Amino acid sequence: MKLRSTFQDHAIDFWLARGAIALIAGLQLMFFNERLIFGSKWLVPTIELVMLVPLSVATGWTQGQARHAEDDGHWHIIYRSRRLIRYFSLLLTAFVSLLNMIALISVTRELLGGAKGGQTLLIDALNIWFTNIIIFALWYWNMDRGGPARLGLHEDTRPDFLFPQMIGNGDKNPAWSPGFVDYFYVSFTNATAFSPTDTMPLSAQSKLLMTIEASISLLTVGIVAARAVNVLT
């Protein structure tokens, strides 16, 4: 029963994750130039939102089923549904990650090619940097302890991240579990410090993801610094 109450406690995290994708689509629509992503500036955000709609509907259906679940059979159906939702969510996150990487490569090429329009390049780079934070928050949330599909339905035995709240007087605190906001904070601090801060990666995959995020962030900040120096000189 304690595990299933954890599912209810973190129900809002699924909607925060869906909202994060919608925010990325909005940022792309408002700030990305058509030269950075293929096709019309409406194409990519539209694809993302079209993929987001069935994902949101499935999330709402699953949470509705969880509120009325009465036996293990119901929870088994919910678990299977959440696994399918997680796979589709990972696909959408990978798609957004690829597009952000393409945009970063395009901005880097323009900077190295001496492109004009310093203000535009700065806005593009900052947008890529912030989008990267959201993307990796989604990756961390989807990866830790087998992802949200297992949350509240299976015992968490091998976490991928060690949060400060998990340690109390040297002992693991089982009453606390991380939510999407916690993973967003981890992503933000990793992108600004270029290394872990108060939350440590434990698994190889978490270390690899944090390394990739820090590298992308370092390159993006380098673009901003290079453009600033160019403007000043």
What annotation goes with each model-predicted range?
Residues S5-G19:
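N-terminal membrane topogenic signal
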Residues R18-Q28, E48-L55, S89-S106, N127, ...:
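Hydrophobic alpha-helical transmembrane segments of multi-pass integral membrane proteins
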Residues Q28-L29, V96-A115, F180-D198:
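Alpha-helical transmembrane segments and their membrane-interface junctions
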Residues L29-K41:
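Short, hydrophobic transmembrane alpha-helix segments
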Residues A58-I85, M101-A115, R145:
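Membrane-helix interface/capping segments
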Residues R109-A149:
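Pore-domain transmembrane helices of cation channels
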Residues N142-T199:
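Membrane-proximal soluble regions of multi-pass membrane proteins
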Residues S177-T233:
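Pore domain of cation channels
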